[in-house]
From Swiss-Prot:
Belongs to the EROs family. Pfam families: ERO1 (PF04137). This is ERO1-like protein alpha. Coiled coil: none annotated. GO terms for biological process: protein folding in endoplasmic reticulum. The Cys-99/Cys-104 and Cys-401/Cys-404 disulfide bonds constitute the redox-active center. The Cys-99/Cys-104 disulfide bond may accept electron from protein disulfide isomerase (PDI) and funnel them to the active site disulfide Cys-401/Cys-404. Predominantly monomer. May function both as a monomer and a homodimer. Keywords: Disulfide bond, Electron transport, Endoplasmic reticulum, FAD, Flavoprotein, Glycoprotein, Membrane, Oxidoreductase, Redox-active center, Signal, Transport. Disulfide bonds join C40-C53, C42-C51, C90-C398, C99-C104, C99-C138, C104-C109, C215-C248, C401-C404. The keyword Endoplasmic reticulum applies. PANTHER family: ERO1-LIKE PROTEIN ALPHA (PTHR12613:SF1), ERO1-RELATED (PTHR12613). It comes from Xenopus tropicalis. It is found in: Endoplasmic reticulum membrane. Glycans are attached at N340, N391, N430.
Amino acid sequence: MVSGCCRLDMSSYVSVLVLCSLLLWGSNSQQEQSSAAQRCFCQVTGYLDDCTCDVETIDHFNNYGLFPKLQQLVASDYFRYYKANLKKPCPFWEDNSHCGVKDCAVKPCPTDEVPGLKPPGFKYTEEANRAHEEIDDCEKEKRLSAVDESLSVEAQEAMLKWNRHDDSADNFCELDDEESPDAEYVDLLKNPERYTGYKGADTWRIWNSIYEENCFKPKAVQRPLNPLTSTRGENEGKVFYNWLDGLCVEKRAFYRLISGLHASINIHLCANYLLKDTWMDKIWGHNTAEFQKRFDATLTQGEGPKRLKNLYFIYLIELRAISKVLPFFERSSFLLYTGNETKDTETKKLLLDVLLDARDFPLHFDENSLFSGDKKEAAKLKEDFRQHFRNISKIMDCVGCFKCRLWGKLQTQGLGTALKILFSERQIENLSESNQPSEFHLTRQEIVALFNAFARISTSVKELENFRTLLEKV
């Protein structure tokens, strides 16, 4: 009888096991069939670390308020031209990576197309810019990563006037790069940030140098999912975040800024991916598979959602900087000079509208939490902070894809300008309406970089909404 009971219990036990297995299989199957959006975004919600702001507040503020205004602003003449030297050699290692990247091969142009052999203004003429007429073989072979440096005659002449106007102002700082004969103005609207085919070991080397050498991290602590690490431990993520949580808020913020910038760049590449490339046309659009590879919690061992939350962190930092710099731009003596008085007035009105919106954001990052300890230690930490960021900006000259290099330079300078603003509160408060030299000044280059960089971050936040909708169908 006891034996029979045991057999009955064992039979019931087996039945329960089978039933549980079926339920578990069904649960896993249901999880696999659940929206891919949940795996990417379910953890990207609520409050951000070291902040009093939540993701949902940023989404609503950006997507339905600030984003469209920023897009209109950076499309204006003042903000669409950025001066960059894309020919500087990498200062850290010998770099020939751009020669080996697919679709980035440099082919010689016919002699009559080489700049300098014809009058300097030739490439800005109507003849040289007829996009749909006699296109030579060199043009047909234009690389995805090539930077379109052509400017109209009107734009070229306007640049000279803009420079003269800037030279008459009291420049707070002058970048050596702008004075280089290799520095050229680039039309950002002609060179959108998007997928170029630049990937693999070369890009890993860039980001590895940024994270490993400039984010205050000891070599003993392994960064999760580092593709250049030969051996990976199961607990590397836990060890890394235990180390990160133990840092002072300033160093932790530095890492999260770089991670957020990295995430933003990846989002742009996924949102503007080359989906179809034929001899007839190129089709660009959202690549959900690429997005999942970078941000799906399952595919990234939980890293993806952390990266996305860091995007919101850098958004808060740059938004705070823009709100703080309002006194600089609202002075009547400040002009967004392009030579077209009517458009310049309209652009400044739009700029002030953006700045006022930024000021009225309800849950700003509190920059007073940074560098608030012992004055001597805080000063040293701030200088370390600045030097590390300068190193990162230099690494941009090692990027093998010229279009990637362009946007890397712009976005690092934009973030650097935002940090400069946050560290200059007293100087900004002491600004006056007069044209007398002041301790705080932004050059045209810094202004263009600041707002274009923030527009890129704003676009990334908006694109998350688009990807969330697309992934709900996957």
